[in-house]
């Protein structure tokens, strides 16, 4: 952080009952849980303080490249634009430093300061120049849907820089997040992202920005048939026909899970738009450290399709 921004630095605070297993981030007057950590992994690997340990584990898991997503930003972290800018700038520079020793093994998604739209393009440019291969977004941002015209400068910049927007299971709206505060995350995080996909496609964002690629990350893929069916009905009411290969035509990729009904989903998604991840370092219902190996070994779908999910499709999404 810049010296002038250090007053915005996140603080770690403990539980009032003294429970050492529970602590929180305090950022801009808001408490956010500092949890969801897979403690069975070595700390050096989990927090990337020792890349050799993490790379060794990646080799065991047959993972060539990891694309790193943030944890703290799944919540709406800042109320004030100046805090948002300080957090995003410092995170992006921290990540650039971390991955610098192993650029062939680690890529990352740059976090844009969306309360400071006039500063977004420069952060995306910094990310692109320092190993970022995507732009992090949440299902709702700045109390707006992602199809809102407010985000058009971001989409234009991302398209020009060949960076996909990667809509991760998360919520950047304080009002929506806090309404679902005690809810486990299905409505708060996952449905916000499904809604983001629907609004982006329904409101014609892929057509408005023909260079833009979109990733829908860490919300399973089970929802795809329902969302596409709903979009098709809405298009018909407007006298339009939804294309038969919606995801491919709109340049949308979606992460699946190994326990998804892949045969059914592939009928709607096609073979060229599914990817998969491990949620490495986390401990929630999307975490699946052996996901790549499991998908390959279980053989639920044909081997050429598995190769696309594990290799061809992520290369296309992230321009690797």
Ranges and model annotations:
Residues 1-320:
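Helix-coil boundary/capping segments in enzymes
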